[in-house]
Structure formats: structure tokens, C-alpha cells
């Protein structure tokens, strides 16, 4: 039987009694967050290096010695499953002369890792365990040497890393927040499996990609959604969870009657969760997309879209119906994301234009304003 997410004991998040737009108001903001290389360097140092960053699915590192690499904003990290079932993570940087220790994105059953340049060997926790012609080095330089540790944790079937390291990083639970962990947890992502991954190289800031998933104002023009959907979307509820994260719930226009009888947002709405700085969960009862724009440079982004589904036997009629519905919906969503990509290409044409100075935001683009205010506060700290 396919899992059907329901609200359960989670508080009502959507309905006529819910104040659906936070008191942020219309605003303006500079274009600098998208185009200024100095600000990007500050973000790397003060935001991205201190945040929990999505790395991949736990199922990619299910057995001892399985590993994946996490690449983001000029950093590269190796995550490895340990013999005791835990995960370790360390910078993917050879401590000899700097090349990447691991050259592939994923792998299985490693016993140790060998730098391809001079053959230095590392154990599964990142410690140097063998150095060719060791007698030619100062013993003090090699004593206890390791690639620096990175904090790593799992939640919802996802692997997360934090470059502050195990001693200094906040807990992943505190970063995501109880409200999102409880609400998003109703979907039981840890029981889902990877169905598809799409990847694009887009010539804009990763923040422009996040923005596209933080408002529904654009959907009528860009995606050509129906007037009924636009009307229903006016009842979207927005929830600022903490100083960083937020969630919103968009009524599904084809289930408005069901929703009016039972304000169960997990069953009758699109549930949308943003974990700062660059992870977006877009949840439907049938499947979940995770949008992950990875910053490469101030105006270049590696954009990943993960699709996860509930597992089952496709020979089972009930699961076959579920899978067919999911596949059709996924095909439509891929078209929608392609339309978003077309806008990023147009933004790339104008990002250096003298006529591009600022953004004018409506009250319903409050999540954009909140997101960039959060970024500015973290840079200032």
C-alpha cells in the first residue's frame, strides 16, 4: 500500500482562519546580491561555509565504504559510510599539495582513498595512513595529519554537511527547525527512493534560482496556469518558521471541495518548504521534488532537481496507478522547470545592463524579501 501523507496531529496551516501573508509589505532591493562578486565572497565565507548544505541521498551511501562527494561554492567534501553505520565527512583536499583526493562523484565499498597525484593514502575518516617515501619528510609535518573534518548528519533520507566542522556547527535539527521537521516529516522522505535527477548549468546567481521557488506571482504568465489555479493560489498560506526558514501551502485547485471539508494541507495542497540557504522541498502527495541550486560563482549555478517517490511493485495494480499518476505529474513539472530555465537565460542577458538597478517587490513576494534580509544579516555578523 502506497503511503498517503496526512496532516495528523500537525497544526492547521491552511484555511479561512489563517492569516496567509506575513506582515512584510511591499519593498525594494538592490540588484547587488545577484551580481556583486565581493558580496558573493562574503556569502561564501559567512553564509555558505556556516550553513547546513544538502549533499545527497542516504541511499547513495548505504553500506560501509560507500561514498559521495559534495561540491559547492568552491568547496569539495567526501562523505563516507563507516563500519559502525555512521557517516564521516572531510575536505576532499590532499594535504600534500592540494589536489582532490577523490575524483568521482560516488562510489561503493572503498577501503581507503588514494590521491592520484603522489599516492598519499587516507582512511575512511580522512586521516593520512600512508605516504610514499615517507623518510624524506619531516616527521612532525606528518604526525596526526588528516584532511580537515566536516560536520555531517542525516535527516529525511538526506545527507547534509556543514563546513564549520563537528565541534562548531549547530545541530542539523536546530538549523531546520521543529516546525519544518514535523510538518515535512509527514511525507516520510526516509522511506522514499530516488526516481530521477535533472541537472542544468545556469548563468545566474543561485539566489535567482531560489527566488523562482519563493513566489507564485509568475505562474500565470510564465507557466500559463488556469485562472482557477491563480484564484486558488491567492489563498496560499506563508509561514516564517525561524529567522532563516519558511514554508507555504498552495491549495490544489482540483481539490478545493475536499480541502474545504478537511483542511489537510498534506493531502489537498502543494506543500513547499525552504531550508536556508539553498534547499527547496516541493511536496505533492504522490512525490517530492527537491530543488538544489549549487553556487559555482557569483553568476553561475549548478542546478539540481531531485525526484523521490514511494517504492513499490509496479505489477501491483494500486502501485501501478500511483506510479502512472506520478510519472505524468513529473513530466509536467519538468516542463515547468524548463520554463524557469528560460527565464534564467533572459536574466543572464540583462545582469550587467545599466538599466537593471533594483527589484520592486509586492507584499506577496514576501519570502524573497525575507530570504535576502536573512542573507544580509548573516553577512553582517
Where in the sequence are the language-model features?
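Short clusters of hydrophobic/aromatic residues that line enzyme substrate/ligand-binding pockets
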Residues: 55, 101, 128, 356, ...
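C-terminal catalytic domain of Rieske-type non-heme iron oxygenases
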Residues: 80, 86, 92, 153, ...
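Generic structural signal for secondary-structure transition and capping sites
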Residues: 48-52, 99, 218
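Rieske [2Fe-2S] iron-sulfur-binding domain
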Residues: 60-165, 169-179
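Short, contiguous pre-domain boundary segments
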Residues: 11-31, 190
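Non-catalytic accessory segments flanking enzyme active sites
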Residues: 29, 33-72
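Basic/polar N-terminal segments that are highly enriched at the extreme N-terminus
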Residues: 1-19, 380-381
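Short Pro/Gly-enriched beta-strand edge/turn motifs at strand-loop
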Residues: 50-62, 131-135, 272-277
Amino acid at each position: 500500500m502506497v503511503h498517503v501523507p496526512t496532516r495528523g496531529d500537525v497544526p492547521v496551516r491552511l484555511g479561512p482562519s489563517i492569516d496567509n501573508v506575513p506582515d512584510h509589505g511591499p519593498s525594494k532591493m538592490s540588484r547587488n546580491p545577484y551580481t556583486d562578486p565581493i558580496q558573493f565572497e562574503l556569502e561564501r565565507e559567512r553564509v555558505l561555509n556556516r550553513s547546513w548544505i544538502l549533499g545527497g541521498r542516504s541511499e547513495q551511501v548505504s553500506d560501509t565504504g560507500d561514498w559521495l562527494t559534495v561540491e559547492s561554492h568552491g568547496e569539495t567534501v567526501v562523505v563516507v559510510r563507516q563500519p559502525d553505520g555512521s557517516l564521516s565527512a572531510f575536505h576532499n583536499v590532499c594535504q600534500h599539495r592540494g589536489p582532490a583526493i577523490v575524483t568521482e562523484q560516488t562510489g561503493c565499498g572503498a577501503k581507503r582513498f588514494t590521491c592520484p597525484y603522489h599516492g598519499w593514502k587516507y582512511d575512511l575518516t580522512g586521516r593520512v595512513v600512508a605516504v610514499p617515501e615517507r623518510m624524506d619528510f619531516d616527521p612532525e609535518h606528518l604526525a596526526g595529519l588528516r584532511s580537515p573534518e566536516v560536520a555531517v548528519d542525516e535527516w529525511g533520507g538526506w545527507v547534509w554537511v556543514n563546513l564549520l566542522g563537528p565541534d562548531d556547527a549547530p545541530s542539523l535539527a536546530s538549523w531546520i527547525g521543529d516546525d519544518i521537521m514535523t510538518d515535512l516529516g509527514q511525507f516520510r522522505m526516509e522511506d522514499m527512493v530516488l526516481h530521477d535527477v535533472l541537472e542544468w548549468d545556469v548563468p545566474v546567481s543561485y539566489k535567482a534560482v531560489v527566488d523562482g521557488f519563493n513566489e507564485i506571482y509568475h505562474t500565470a504568465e510564465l507557466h500559463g496556469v488556469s485562472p482557477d489555479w491563480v484564484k486558488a493560489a491567492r489563498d496560499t498560506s506563508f509561514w516564517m518558521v525561524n529567522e532563516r526558514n519558511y514554508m507555504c501551502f498552495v491549495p490544489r485547485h482540483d481539490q478545493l471541495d475536499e480541502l474545504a471539508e478537511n483542511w489537510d494541507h498534506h493531502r489537498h495542497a502543494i506543500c513547499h518548504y525552504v531550508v536556508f540557504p539553498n534547499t527547496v522541498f516541493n511536496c505533492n502527495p504522490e512525490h517530492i521534488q527537491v530543488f538544489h541550486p549549487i553556487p559555482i560563482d557569483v553568476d553561475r549555478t549548478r542546478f539540481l532537481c531531485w525526484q523521490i517517490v514511494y517504492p513499490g511493485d509496479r505489477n501491483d495494480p494500486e502501485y501501478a496507478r500511483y506510479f502512472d499518476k506520478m510519472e505524468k505529474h513529473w513530466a509536467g513539472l519538468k516542463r515547468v522547470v524548463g520554463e524557469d530555465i528560460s527565464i534564467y537565460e533572459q536574466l543572464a542577458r540583462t545582469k550587467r545592463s545599466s538599466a537593471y538597478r533594483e527589484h520592486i517587490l509586492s507584499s506577496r513576494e514576501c519570502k524573497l524579501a525575507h530570504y535576502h534580509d536573512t542573507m544580509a544579516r548573516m553577512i553582517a555578523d
